[in-house]
């Protein structure tokens, strides 16, 4: 096939230049329109924190530094003597959800584009700065707390940086959370003055059922 040879190229035709405005910059943030979306966002950040290598390393350090081997309520439940005992680290007086929500408020109020990893990173760093309160609990005690059955005094918690946290994030703590904190401080002082608190909820309690129409074997007295 013979190649076509162009003897002369004429580019003298009329040119038209079109001016286009600079494209609008689109931030990489997330918009939370409903309370449901906000809650989902916070829980996702929580998951990122708990599953991160940095958080796991911190919890390991926390347990080692404070020589944690037992539940703060049941000291006889010791991981050294009982292999099946599992301790969970509880956040108090602000839960991990509360802390994440407060950090989220900071980003929203300062027009910082929302990003899961950015917020999770800040929450994790607060742990390393010892600005969150932590306490070791057995699984049962931890569950009872979240059911509202027991109260954890602030003085029982590792809260060295709590005051610093409140001062730094005061503008971002919801008013209802501030009210709860004030009430917790009040109750903690009362417990400290009394020297103890009612832990009867943690004692054994047997429930016997009497079902109409059913006959149960009687215990034979010796």
Q: What do these predicted regions represent?
A:
Residues 2:
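BZIP DNA-binding basic region
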Residues 87-92, 132-141, 191, 198-200:
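Extended, compositionally biased low-complexity polar/Lys-Gly-rich tracts
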Residues 55-110, 138-140:
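Short cysteine-rich loop/turn motifs with clustered Cys
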Residues 6-47, 143-222:
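C-terminal/domain-terminus segments
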Residues 51-54, 114, 138, 174:
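Short, structured coil/loop segments at alpha-helix boundaries
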Residues 102-126, 167-189:
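Short Fe-S-cluster ligation motifs
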Residues 112-119, 123-157:
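Short Cys/His-centered divalent metal-binding micro-motifs
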Residues 47-60, 116-123:
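Short Cys/His-rich Zn2+-coordinating modules
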